Amino acid sequence: MRKTKRRPVSVGEMLKVEFLEPMGITSKALAEAMGVHRNTVSNLINGGVLTAPVAIKLAAALGNTPEFWLNIQHAVDLWDTRNRYQEEAKFVKPLFVSLEQSART
C-alpha cells in the first residue's frame, strides 16, 4: 500500500489549473457547455465532490474521459479517509498475513 504525505490534487485544482486557466475558459462557459448550473462548476473548483453524472458531462465538454475525473476524486477520497481512520486501523486484527509481511520473515 503506497502512502503519500501530501493530499492528491483535487478535481477542482486540476480543472482550474490544467484546463480552465490555460484554455481561457470561464466557469460560466464550462457550466453552459455541460448543461449544468454555474454553481455546480463553482462548487467543484472550490473543493466540492465530483459525482459520476457530472464527471460524464465534464469529460464530454473537455474531451477526456469520466474515468480521468473520477480517478482524481477517488484518490482524494481515499487519502482523506485513510488519514482520518489510520489510528482505528491499527486495532484491526488481520485474518491473513500479507505477502509483504511474509517476505520479511
UniProtKB/Swiss-Prot annotation:
Induction: Induced by amino acid starvation. Induced by the protein synthesis inhibitors chloramphenicol, kanamycin and to a lesser extent by spectinomycin. Residues 27-46 bind DNA. One of its GO terms (molecular function) is DNA binding. SMART domains: HTH_XRE. Residues 15-69 form the HTH cro/C1-type domain. Keywords: DNA-binding, Toxin-antitoxin system, Transcription, Transcription regulation. SUPFAM superfamilies: lambda repressor-like DNA-binding domains. HigB-1/HigA-1 has been shown to stabilize plasmids very efficiently in E.coli. NCBIfam families: antidote_HigA (TIGR02607). Antitoxin component of a type II toxin-antitoxin (TA) system that counteracts the effect of the HigB-1 toxin. Binds to its own promoter and regulates transcription of the higB-1/higA-1 operon. This is Antitoxin HigA-1. It comes from Vibrio cholerae serotype O1 (strain ATCC 39315 / El Tor Inaba N16961). The gene is higA-1.
